[in-house]
Amino acid sequence: MKPLVAFLVVLSIFGIQSQAEEIFNIFVPSKNGGNIQETVTIDNQQNTATINIHSGSCSSTTIFDYKHGYIASRVLSRRACYVIKMDHKAIPALDKLQRFLYEKQTMNAIDSPEYTWVRYNPLKSLITKVDWFLFGSPIRQLCKHMPLYEGEVATKPKEVSTGACAKVGLLGILGVSICGGIHL
């Protein structure tokens, strides 16, 4: 009887640990006819979603830290990190995101046309004294050795602007774009 109880305890511990993290691989068609790979890791213990977009110099890593309420993106070509306070009205809850990813991966029929634009001014929004406790350790690990900029949500890209945008997050799901430069 004791070996059976010990086996069930070990099985339940490993079962709980395996449910703590879930990984999704999504392939999105690119404009040049190829595919862009997105890897999404949902960590239920840390209450985070980490999105890696594998697209050459446009590759990025984005962390949605639901515990601390921040989103941070590191864009390979920019060699910088961008952080924004999470708007829970615009960003789905972690369990809804997880369900959406599951449905997208298994049925490959769900898509969202909505995009969230994040705007920053590189001359005014550099964060020089970073309070890592506020942002949490997942964002600290992502952005510790990079310049960190504060972003703001924009309803749509401005008509007249200089600079460029890079897509981060989930291209087909959350559609977050980082835009730098001067907007008139």
Swiss-Prot record:
PROSITE patterns: BRICHOS. Its main location: secreted. GO terms for cellular component: basal part of cell; extracellular region; Golgi apparatus. It is found in: Secreted; Golgi apparatus. Pfam families: BRICHOS. Stomach foveolar epithelium and duodenal Brunner's glands. Keywords: Disulfide bond, Golgi apparatus, Secreted, Signal. Residues 1-20 form the signal peptide. Disulfide bonds join 81-143. One of its GO terms (biological process) is gene expression. It comes from the Eukaryota. Residues 54-151 form the BRICHOS domain. Heterodimer with TFF1; disulfide linked. Interacts with TFF2. This is Gastrokine-2.
